[in-house]
């Protein structure tokens, strides 16, 4: 008799095996085992058979489930141990105080619910604690991310809202939205989010919209394969850029406003020089993914110190690099690629188990964050060749469609008239280097998904 089981447990096991064999018409085997154990047929009446005939199968399937759960927990333990191993004693104590090394963690500070369908996009107000979300329910909702409260619901679009973005124009901070209804709408936050303009011109769903820094312009990307540049004041389309052969899924302007990065269904990412709006120039086409490119991002200058060595740039030359030196793309092939401006792929980040839906660079420059249809958010350390150092598993209950980092807070400092204007974009690209402004990183990240939720991660 097994020393692992008590006498009662052994008897239960024997009865379960005999009942299982009998239920599956293995009567000879059941009779042989019953004889070997010295059990009479009277022991197995109808009631006993019913009780034990499925017990063995239930035990077996429960063991398989437990084994899977154990394996998942072991994998999570390994990931957490790796994160601990990568952290120095000082970094562990300072991480919460140092914005440059802060990373989001679960649980989220708030999980905001009000949308009735998939939340496709989010955008932070550049100054206040407001955040906008757009949904398949055709609505835009404005929230206070510090308080976790709904402030307003904007109605105007007639189909899914696919993109939102805050930006600073001549008239102040504005909110732009785009939709499957083929329109772009501009809303004025200082006037109760009044819809002040509707831009028409695209011939299919408008998938992304972004303000172009410092130029009173908007750029939009569409399923009609075009990029369009719009004058925010007049609402006129000032230029249509053609080049993609499929749906343009995403567009991202450079921090100085002179370049556009676009990507989409033709499995390419393209860099455009729009210094001269009337004559945009295609500068670069990046090819390397194996499936649709869902998202793209321009690296901030704070990332250059980590990425430049991979591109063969010497340390002393990093400060001389331009506004668009490195970019990242996320694809349905489950990978993220980081490129230099020559079109060389510096690294391919592998780890997600499903489509990559959104990517964002940490304002401090050291990390790249991504979200995926595998319901996780991953943090990649660019100083360690893109190693995944943190995973927020099950960050949402379904696919994660959007991920944004709150823009930096810029505090102007006094400077001489000839020392540069001291201004910076939302990710810290300095425009005046003699007396740079005080740029404060806001440790706030938002994600949104098919579970109809908007999650806020904050320090």
Swiss-Prot record:
The keyword Cell division is assigned to this record: yes
Broad class of where this protein is predominantly found: cytoplasm
GO annotation terms (biological process): cell division; establishment of mitotic spindle orientation; microtubule sliding
WD repeats: 114-155, 157-197, 201-240, 243-282, 288-349, 351-390, 395-434, 436-459
GO CC terms in record: cytoplasm; microtubule; microtubule associated complex; spindle pole; transferase complex
Coiled coil: 63-88
Similarity-based family: Belongs to the WD repeat LIS1/nudF family.
Protein name as it appears in the record: Nuclear distribution protein nudF
Lineage, broadest ranks: Eukaryota, Fungi, Dikarya, Ascomycota, Pezizomycotina
